[in-house]
Amino acid sequence: MQLNSTEISELIKQRIAQFNVVSEAHNEGTIVSVSDGIIRVHGLADVMQGEMISLPGNRYAIALNLERDSVGAVVMGPYADLAEGMKVKCTGRILEVPVGRGLLGRVVNTLGAPIDGKGALDHDGFSAVEAIAPGVIERQSVDEPVQTGYKSVDAMIPIGRGQRELIIGDRQTGKTALAIDAIINQRDSGIKCVYVAIGQKASTISNVVRKLEEHGALENTIVVVATASESAALQYLAPYAGCAMGEYFRDRGEDALIIYDDLSKQAVAYRQISLLLRRPPGREAYPGDVFYLHSRLLERASRVNADYVEAFTKGEVKGKTGSLTALPIIETQAGDVSAFVPTNVISITDGQIFLESNLFNAGIRPAVNPGISVSRVGGAAQTKIMKKLSGGIRTALAQYRELAAFSQFASDLDDATRKQLSHGQKVTELLKQKQYAPMSVAQQSLVLFAAERGYLEDVDLSKVGSFEAALLAYADREHGELLQQIDQTGAYNDEIEGKFKGILDTFKATQSW
């Protein structure tokens, strides 16, 4: 075989022309220590605060401490097989989670991966877990209500769209029950819901998901889960991931509701991470920035104006405001609301619903203490009918508590005092409500009207519950159109007042309970 030099040179030229060199510059570092989910890395000179660091085995860590000679990072997931000397790389990316309508009805972990066995997620893109809250100019005042379906909350501690209302109380006082019922009540309101479970047992979360499914509310809800068995890093980041998913709807001119259950466990997870990173401890061993931990999260819940929505959607959505309403939950120890984390969150939020174990154990459920529960901005969002009828309830309860304390020492009470005590007891009984039984605005209004106008005076205390159930069944059967009209408009006028009087007079004259 004879080789032609011309052919060889042509072949070499062709190969040289086709030769393509792709060079990638990686900022690479070396793990120098691994302990309790924290790694220290040497050599990552260009790493950003909060950047994802690529680890062997398709895992990531997040850079939290940038020091002179090393980087302290928290591992997202299992870390038992990581060892000193392993190579890691910068990614140049901040942690992002999938967002979109495809997440509704799904259960996901902190990183947005589905854990409900229903297949891959259908998402609309990714969003950074850490985002700057809307500015002052981009916001709009709260003037539309979020109905929880609880008489005691909607009447005395109303919540508006875009508000942050803290639910605070000891363990086993009905905090999660109140939040779950608020989600169930949004089935037909158009409000999308996000439930973030932090540091809870997997069995508890499974029960919550099942209840949401049973009541037809799961298809409207995203459940974000960081169980007690997961790393502190995932528990710390879960609320931010859930918030990013909720902001997707807010920024597109829709309304969303997010529940953080609960932020006490998130603060404990953050304290654990901070101590392992050797940050100096402060009060109750929490780091100095634990206030900022919660403020930067809760400030993202807001009502944004139409200009913000139009600018965000590049003109696709016009004339619509968006909102993200937050119901953070805080667990107290022995009713101590003056502890570090509870006082922080109380000062950040727009009011609090305080649930008391004494009331809960006495059978008053929801165990709301109306004396120290408050809504700072929700009053402006109340429907006209609720605002008109709820004023007397708070006053009646305040007078009842004062007289009840006084009557323990006074043996002889006059008729007016006895009447007030009896009225207060009946109002307290009337505000009791079973779990998973939220009430519409019209139903609540009719019941409050009956209490305020003295229709309970001749009803025995033990019969108040059956009186209410019979009244609502009668009104629904005979005056369904009126109730629907009130639910749609929330209006209150002389005509509606007259109709309510007619309903109650006829009911008391013709029905038994």
UniProtKB/Swiss-Prot annotation:
Subcellular location: Cell inner membrane
Swiss-Prot/TrEMBL catalytic activity: ATP + H2O + 4 H(+)(in) = ADP + phosphate + 5 H(+)(out)
Gene3D superfamilies in UniProt: 2.40.30.20, ATP synthase alpha/beta chain, C-terminal domain, P-loop containing nucleotide triphosphate hydrolases
Membrane topology field: Peripheral membrane protein
Record-level GO cellular component terms: plasma membrane; proton-transporting ATP synthase complex
A molecular function (GO) term: proton-transporting ATP synthase activity, rotational mechanism
PROSITE patterns: ATPASE_ALPHA_BETA
Known function: Produces ATP from ADP in the presence of a proton gradient across the membrane. The alpha chain is a regulatory subunit.
Family: Belongs to the ATPase alpha/beta chains family.
Name this polypeptide is given: ATP synthase subunit alpha
Gene behind this protein: atpA
